């Protein structure tokens, strides 16, 4: 399945764009690098996984995307606490990434059930 057809890919790519824009002028290059890499990793791993022939490989890349989502939640919390982003924006991103995580779990379960048949 092409990743561009998946809502989870679309939403995670959109969130990554928002993160990149929000941190474009951030002078803390270490933090900026980490949070943008995490946000980019989610849609990138979804895309890479969906191009794999094996259901096991597809599931593995979705697992990596889930891990990157968890990293991003942590970095969002820290960004709020150190005033790199407004609380409202951070909480909106956190809510979105939690929805993305639910979608990843659902997609992974679907793929895993297909591989059992």
Q: How should each PLM-predicted stretch be described?
A:
Residues 1-117:
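Amphipathic alpha-helical assembly/interaction segments
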